[in-house]
């Protein structure tokens, strides 16, 4: 069973620009519905597979701190989805994924959100301010140096 982390950036952003930050060797494929997707299998190097897709009229919801429902509806968006096996999650996948998320956030200025399995809110960035959420379940103080928080 895989664990999915998804970073969503608000805006009409070319997928290639995000791929330069997330997975420079990503190859173009298509989604099940025929949309564009850039994908890279980085299991050996980083412990995950990454897919980059875009869309319009997005709707996202997840559990915020304290169990409240967080909702977001970006007009246009790009999703960077990281899929990792549970056996590589802690030693390889999660640290590399968080470093990649930090690199994307440093290289892009758009509002953003990071979720776990589509239902737990981890990070949001609104108007340039990044906020951590549900830190008991995932955050370690060592990550402060990755995110420069």
Give the role of each language-model region.
Residues 8, 81-83, 115:
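Residues in well-ordered beta-strands of folded domains
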Residues 10, 14-24, 86-111:
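Ampiphathic alpha-helical segments that act as solvent-exposed interaction surfaces
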């Amino acid at each position: 069973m895989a664990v999915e982390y998804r970073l969503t950036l608000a805006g009409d952003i070319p997928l290639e620009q995000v791929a330069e930050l997330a997975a420079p060797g990503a190859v173009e494929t298509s989604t099940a519905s025929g949309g564009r997707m850039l994908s890279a299998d980085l299991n050996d190097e980083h412990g995950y597979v990454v897919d980059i897709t875009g869309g319009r009229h997005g709707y996202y919801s997840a559990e915020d701190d304290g169990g409240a429902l967080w909702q977001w509806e970006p007009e246009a968006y790009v999703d960077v989805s990281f899929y990792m096996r549970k056996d590589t999650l802690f030693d390889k996948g999660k640290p590399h994924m968080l470093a990649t998320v930090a690199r994307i956030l440093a290289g892009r200025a758009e509002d953003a959100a990071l979720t776990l399995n589509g239902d737990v809110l981890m990070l949001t960035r609104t108007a340039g301010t990044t906020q951590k959420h549900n830190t008991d379940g995932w955050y370690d103080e060592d990550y402060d140096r990755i995110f420069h928080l």
